[in-house]
């Protein structure tokens, strides 16, 4: 009975871990046994950190990125170029761009891309919120950093058309990111070069 219970619990743990992006069943298997071998104090600390992070991290009310407060550190920073916005698909894209140290402006998260096949249209994204920020924050350039996919391209084109009537320079992240690739998988050099080589839309 105990043996079956242990196997059942392990299977559930492995299944839960393998549902995470980038973790296959073999990796989930190794992680599960590593966690079981952890000293109880370290294990409790690990679980506490996960729970604490999940409970305290929220979305910035201004840009939509992850934040510990209502407005994130980048949005309130006076050291950032508040006249330049970088528009990304997801909050995690900001972390990869920040690692390049090439972009010194502020961000806006769309929370996805236009995808008719999945029933996602412009109204399902944070496009309205972006347009509402342009004039009050005196934005002069919007760098569109959507992924070079069909959906990312369609979203970039839509944004460019929406921003045309406004007196703002619209650019897009360029060379270095392969078509069909993603910002998350690009190395710092490639992503940095893409930011430096952004194109006028």
UniProtKB/Swiss-Prot annotation:
Q: Where are the transmembrane segments?
A: none
For whether the record's keyword set contains Electron transport, the answer is no
**In residue numbers, where are the C4-type zinc fingers?**
60-75
| Protein task | May play a role in DNA repair. It seems to be involved in an RecBC-independent recombinational process of DNA repair. It may act with RecF and RecO.
Q: Does the keyword Zinc-finger apply?
A: yes
* One matching Pfam family: Toprim_4
GO MF term (any one):
DNA binding
> What gene name is given for the protein in this entry?
recR
Task: Enumerate the NCBIfam families for this protein.
Answer: recR
Show where the Toprim domain sits: 83-178
What UniProt keywords apply to this chain's record, in alphabetical order?
DNA damage, DNA recombination, DNA repair, Metal-binding, Zinc, Zinc-finger
Q: Which family does it belong to?
A: Belongs to the RecR family.
Protein name per UniProt: Recombination protein RecR
Q: One biological-process term from Gene Ontology? A: recombinational repair
């Amino acid at each position: 009975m105990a043996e079956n219970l242990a196997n059942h619990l392990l299977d559930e743990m492995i299944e839960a871990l393998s549902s995470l992006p980038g973790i296959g069943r073999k990796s989930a298997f190794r992680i599960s046994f590593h966690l079981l071998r952890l000293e109880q104090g370290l294990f409790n600390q690990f679980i506490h950190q996960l729970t604490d992070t999940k409970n305290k991290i929220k979305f910035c009310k201004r840009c939509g990125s992850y934040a510990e407060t209502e407005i994130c550190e980048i949005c309130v920073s006076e050291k950032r170029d508040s006249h330049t916005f970088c528009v990304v698909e997801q909050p995690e894209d900001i972390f990869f761009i920040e690692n390049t140290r090439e972009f010194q402006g502020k961000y806006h998260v769309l929370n996805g891309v236009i995808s008719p096949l999945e029933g996602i249209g412009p109204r399902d994204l944070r496009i309205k919120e972006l347009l509402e920020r342009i004039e009050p924050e005196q934005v002069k350039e919007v760098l569109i950093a959507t992924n070079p996919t069909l959906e990312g391209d369609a979203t970039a084109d839509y944004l460019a058309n929406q921003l045309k009537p406004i007196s703002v320079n619209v650019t897009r992240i360029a060379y270095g990111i392969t078509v069909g690739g993603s910002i998350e998988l690009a190395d710092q050099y490639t992503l940095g070069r893409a930011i430096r080589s952004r194109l006028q839309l």
